Each structure stands twice: as structure tokens, then as C-alpha cells.
Regions:
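Thiolate-centered catalytic microenvironments shared by cysteine-dependent enzyme domains
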Residues: 4-7, 39-42, 47-55, 119-207, ...
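Signal peptide processing junction and immediate N-terminal pro/mature segment
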Residues: 19-49
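C-terminal soluble interaction/assembly domains
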Residues: 272-274, 282-334
Length: 334
């Protein structure tokens, strides 16, 4: 709910009194506590640059996306930083102490299952501990919204699904985070100096398997399927190794980057909700997103959950779906 003008004025006066001089809003409308489509409270902090920001651990249970200032606060309080950008970008600078990771190191390697998480939970646990993931420490994931593939959202979706409920991505990615006076380095680290202690406690709310998707498609009860790929892929192009082209019948085309502005920040919440309404996405639907290998759709799932939607990522996505029988895994070309 929005604060009154009087309350806002008092807040600004008090801020000035303690030396906080810069208040700027990010794309989710400052000083608001957005409601989700079902009127349950979702805490999305919205202060982009402020000298003092406090993020409570309880807030992160529902908040999957943070502003650069909130990320800075979390990092200064000891959060683990995972950098999912490409190596060339990392060479030009990383947050000091960040660990360079890729979504592939936590995923299966054999076609057509490259989008799915490792089946061996012991191996997956060890990989996460090696990069410094602790059960009781926040994890801040840094990506490249403009030039990447939504790897930061994929990483957040993965860790949340595996039971780490203090994992967040930074709105605006590395470029935005580099503007909030954090120490930087050009040294690339791929393993933490102190291994983490994370234990997987899987949460099924945000994932769906191929078999479950087939079942849901047969009834389509309260189901919306979103194709997070480019329009050309939706229409049948196969630039990334899919066995067959097209899209899942009834899917809505929504390229995930439609939710970003020219600087890589998320669009204002109101605009995202309007965009979803225009694509005929009901507020109370269960939304299943897919792409090629669950990366772009993982990002979209993270954003949708942060907004308060019931959202699931089909990690197998088109690599797996298109490799299945055409009689079972139908595709539409147009």
C-alpha cells in the first residue's frame, strides 16, 4: 500500500536530517509495497540509490529481486555473490569476493536434458558448497540483463527450488551494481576460499516436469503456458539445437526481454502487469514458462514469482520437449 503524502514528506525530512541526501526510485515505484494479483502482500523494495538500506531476512522469503542499494547492503552484511556473466565481462571487473559460476555446471550435460538440474543431489550439493553457498547466508546473483540470457534468474530459480530462500538477483545487473560504490576486482575466482554448508531441501512449487506438463495440458485447468523465446523461435525457427521447431499448443509468446527497459532494469510493475493482461494472462492462473533449456524461462519465473504469481519453470524446455515423440509432445508451427 502507498504511503500518504504527509508520511512521505516526513520520511524525506527525517532522511535529510541524518544525512541521506539521495533518494531515487527504481522501476518498481518507490515507497510502495506491491500486492500480488491475489491481494497477498509481496515485499518488493524499490529504492535504487540510498545511503542506508536495510533488508530483513524475512523479507527475502517473498522477494526474489533486489535493487542495487539493497544488494549492496546484503553484500556488506556478508552475502555470497555469484557472478553469472560471460568470462569476457567478468575479466573487465567483478564485485570483490564474487565467485564466477555458470548455470551449466549445475545442470545435466547429455542431450536432450541439458536444461535440467543434475539428478545426483550429492554432486549438486558439492558444487554449491564449492562456490560458497551457506544455508544461513543470503546469495546475491549478478547478471547481464542486456547481453545475457537471463542466467541470473535461472540461478535464483535453481537455488530457491533447492531450498535456499535468501537468493536474489540484482535489478539492472552488474552495470547497476557497479554504481553503488562496492569494491571491485579484476581477479576471477571460481571457488570459494571457505566452502559452504548448504543442504538441499527441494521445493516443488516452482518447477514442472515434462510428464506433469503433459498431464496439465490435457486438462488445461487454470493453466497458462508462456514461451519466453524470441518470436522467430515461437514461429518455428530452431537456432539452438531443438529437434523440432514450433511451440507448445496454446502457448503465449512473451520474449522475456520485453519486461526490461533500455538499461536492463525491469519495467515498472504496472507496465508488466498491463503487458500480461494484454497477453491474456489471468492473475490467478498457474503460469508455466519454457524456452530452449530453462534459462530464459527460469528468469521469467523468478520475475513472476516476485510479482506474486503462481509460476513454474519447465527446465527441460524445448530441448527435451522437441526430442520427445510428436504424438505425445505436440508442437505448433505458425
Amino acid at each position: 500500500m502507498k504511503l500518504s503524502k504527509l508520511t512521505m514528506a516526513i520520511a524525506i525530512i527525517l532522511a535529510g536530517a541524518i544525512g541521506i541526501t539521495t533518494l531515487a526510485t527504481n522501476s518498481f515505484n518507490s515507497f510502495t509495497t506491491p500486492s500480488n494479483p491475489n491481494d497477498n502482500t509481496v515485499l518488493n523494495s524499490t529504492i535504487d540509490t540510498i545511503d542506508a538500506v536495510v533488508v530483513q531476512p524475512s523479507q527475502l522469503a517473498n522477494q526474489w529481486i533486489v535493487s542495487p542499494a539493497e544488494a549492496k547492503y546484503l553484500i556488506e552484511q556478508g552475502a555470497i555473490v555469484l557472478d553469472v556473466r560471460d568470462r569476457d565481462s567478468q575479466t573487465n571487473g567483478m564485485v570483490q569476493g564474487a565467485i564466477a559460476v555458470s548455470w551449466q555446471q549445475f545442470s545435466q550435460s547429455k542431450f536432450p536434458h541439458q536444461g535440467k538440474l543434475l539428478e545426483d543431489e550429492l554432486a549438486l550439493t558439492q558444487h554449491l558448497r564449492n562456490v560458497g553457498v551457506f544455508s544461513n547466508k543470503a546469495v546475491v546473483v549478478v547478471g547481464d540483463p542486456l547481453n545475457g540470457w537471463g542466467e541470473d534468474g535461472r540461478m535464483v530459480w535453481m537455488l530457491r527450488t533447492l531450498g535456499h530462500q535468501q537468493t536474489v538477483l540484482v535489478d539492472g545487473g552488474y552495470l547497476a551494481l557497479s554504481r553503488v560504490d562496492l569494491p571491485m576486482t579484476q581477479t576471477i575466482s571460481q571457488a570459494a576460499a571457505i566452502p559452504g554448508d548448504f543442504v538441499i531441501q527441494r521445493i516443488r512449487d516452482w518447477e514442472i516436469t515434462q510428464e506433469d506438463l503433459r498431464t496439465r495440458l490435457a486438462t488445461r485447468k487454470n493453466l497458462v503456458v508462456i514461451d519466453a523465446r524470441e518470436p522467430r523461435e515461437f514461429a518455428g525457427a530452431t537456432p539452438y539445437g531443438e529437434q523440432r521447431g514450433g511451440h507448445i499448443p496454446g502457448a503465449i509468446s512473451l520474449h522475456y526481454k520485453e519486461l526490461l527497459d533500455a538499461e536492463g532494469h525491469l519495467l515498472p510493475r504496472s507496465k508488466i502487469l498491463a503487458l500480461l493482461r494484454d497477453r491474456h494472462v489471468p492473475s490467478n492462473a498457474i503460469i508455466v514458462s519454457y524456452c530452449t533449456g530453462g534459462v530464459r524461462s527460469g528468469w521469467l519465473t523468478s520475475v513472476l514469482v516476485d510479482l506474486g504469481f503462481q509460476a513454474q519453470n519447465y527446465a527441460g524446455s524445448m530441448w527435451e520437449w522437441s526430442a520427445g515423440s510428436a504424438n505425445q509432445n505436440h508442437l505448433v508451427n505458425h
